[in-house]
């Protein structure tokens, strides 16, 4: 049986997301999240403009000769610096607190046809390593549904508690959300 890595797309790379990626980001959000959990165009634009260093995309390049013909976004992570030690309804909006040491991840998504190939692990590990080395903050926090907890634990996140703040919002009250965190330690990725 062939391993999933043998079917990885060619010419993959990770780079910071920019405002010119907005259309592809919106498309990916619509494929990865139910309508009530998607970030709006306004919020995504805010994040791309105010904290692009916290927004990473996994792309496939279509190359002809030495020329790049097209870049296709197949995964992304979007975050902001948040004022609390956990995700709140407020922090999921248009909020970036530059002086904060807490980075809130608001979305991790891989295009459906590229799932189950460890690409989310690749993207998230790269994200954690970059933030650790750049000393942008000292902790990453996120909220997750219970089925995703083992995935986040594999890349070093720990369960903190059930998030009761987001449950107060009608868009998020239908399911249980779990607060998770991961320390950013520069020495962890030193060579």
From Swiss-Prot:
GO molecular function annotation: aralkylamine N-acetyltransferase activity; diamine N-acetyltransferase activity
> What is this protein identified as?
Polyamine N-acetyltransferase 1
Alphabetical list of Gene3D superfamilies matching this protein: 3.40.630.30
A GO BP entry: chromatin organization
Please tell me whether the keyword Transferase is annotated for this protein. yes
Annotated Gene Ontology cellular components are: cytoplasm
Q: Which residues form the signal peptide?
A: none
Q: Which family does it belong to?
A: Belongs to the acetyltransferase family. AANAT subfamily.
The record's InterPro entries line, in alphabetical order, gives: Acyl_CoA_acyltransferase, GNAT_dom, SNAT-like
Q: What class of enzyme is it?
A: transferase
Domain N-acetyltransferase: start-end pairs:
12-179
Query: From what superkingdom does this record's organism come?
Result: Eukaryota
In the Enzyme Commission scheme, what number(s) does this protein have?
2.3.1.-
Q: What does this protein do?
A: Acetylates spermine and probably also other polyamines such as putrescine or spermidine. May regulate the levels of polyamines on chromosomal DNA, which would modify chromatin structure and affect transcription or replication. Also able to acetylate arylalkylamines such as tryptamine and serotonin in vitro.
Q: Where in the cell is it found?
A: Cytoplasm
Which keywords does UniProt give here?
Acyltransferase, Cytoplasm, Transferase
Q: Per the annotation, which location comes first and is thus the protein's main one?
A: cytoplasm
Leftover remarks:
Present with 8680 molecules/cell in log phase SD medium.
